[in-house]
């Protein structure tokens, strides 16, 4: 695989991980409220 495609895949994976973390944090905040 070429470098640009690898970089795009990593960016997408990082964005997905950040979205999951944000959702988990929001759920924790809602549960604590």
From Swiss-Prot:
Q: Which domain of life is it from?
A: Eukaryota
Work out whether the entry's keyword set contains Repeat. Answer: yes
Q: Which controlled-vocabulary keywords does the entry list?
A: Antifreeze protein, Repeat
Question: Which family does this protein fall into?
Answer: Belongs to the type-I AFP family.
Record function comment: Antifreeze proteins lower the blood freezing point.
Instruction: Return the protein name.
Output: Ice-structuring protein SS-3
User: What is the scientific name of the source organism?
Assistant: Myoxocephalus scorpius
Q: What is the lineage of its organism?
A: Eukaryota, Metazoa, Chordata, Craniata, Vertebrata
